[in-house]
Design a protein with these regions (language model features):
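Conserved P-loop NTPase "ATPase switch" module shared by AAA+ and STAND
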Residues: 1
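Sensor-1/coupling segment of RecA-like P-loop NTPase cores
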Residues: 5-28, 153
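Basic, low-complexity intrinsically disordered segments
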Residues: 12-14, 34, 148, 169
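Conserved beta-strand termini and adjacent loop/short-helix elements that scaffold enzyme active sites
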Residues: 16, 40, 162-164
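Accessory nucleic acid-recognition modules appended to NTPase machines
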Residues: 78-209
Length: 209
């Protein structure tokens, strides 16, 4: 159907959808060379504040806890907001990744999620994570598998990798990088709305701005 529409002059076609329909790599594969990708991220704090207004400090505290998923603004109370974020994480994001990517070790995927969520902005890499899982959990998962799983989390727009620009040569592959949550509210929901270290949360929020 889309190919038929492409033949009509002076027509722009916008194809939208959540990650439950298409992950990032699916979009690139389906429409390679025939489209432009426009990524719509959760609200930054600036966008969030433009919607809620009021005292900026109070708005920031609210944003640092619940994040910038737009539907959060329509939830009536704290319990509803927390339940929404928990459900979104478990029923949409995790299920999509497991089903579409054929994840064989969901337990390892969720361990990686917990580790990244609890240490946003900290330096790490797949080898370090693999060693941590081996020492703490007795897991024999390879660094390559960890790298692939992290790639799936990025592909689902749960995390974004920040690399150093002063690393060259072979060390580029082994040097630790930082991973930031695409939405701090989803990060908080994953770890039960605890570990509210404001320095790391603020760093994550600034990165997303």
């Amino acid at each position: 159907a889309l190919n038929d529409l492409r033949g009509i002059s002076n027509l722009d076609v916008y194809v939208t959808g959540s990650n439950s329909k298409m992950l990032s790599s699916d979009i690139l594969t389906e429409f390679r060379g025939r489209s432009d990708e426009i990524r719509v991220h959760p609200l930054s704090f600036a966008e969030y504040y433009s919607a809620v207004g009021g005292d900026k400090n109070e708005a920031f505290d609210e944003y640092a806890f619940y994040g910038g998923m737009p539907l959060i603004l329509s939830r009536p109370d704290d319990i509803a907001k927390m339940n929404y974020l928990k459900s979104l994480f478990s029923e949409v994001y995790i299920k999509d990744i497991v089903e579409r990517k054929g994840i064989e070790r969901q337990d390892v995927l969720e361990q990686i999620l917990d580790l990244l969520c609890s240490s946003v902005g900290s330096l790490t890499n797949p080898t370090k994570i693999a060693n941590t899982l081996k020492s703490k959990q007795g897991s024999g998962v390879s660094a390559n598998t960890i790298r692939a799983y992290i790639g799936h989390l990025e592909d689902a727009f749960l995390f974004s990798e920040s690399k150093r620009y002063d690393v060259k040569g072979k060390s580029y592959f082994d040097y630790p990088n930082k991973y930031y949550s695409e939405d701090i509210g989803l990060r908080n929901a994953r770890i039960g709305f605890r570990q509210q270290e404001m320095t790391h949360i603020m760093e994550n929020i600034i990165y997303n701005e």
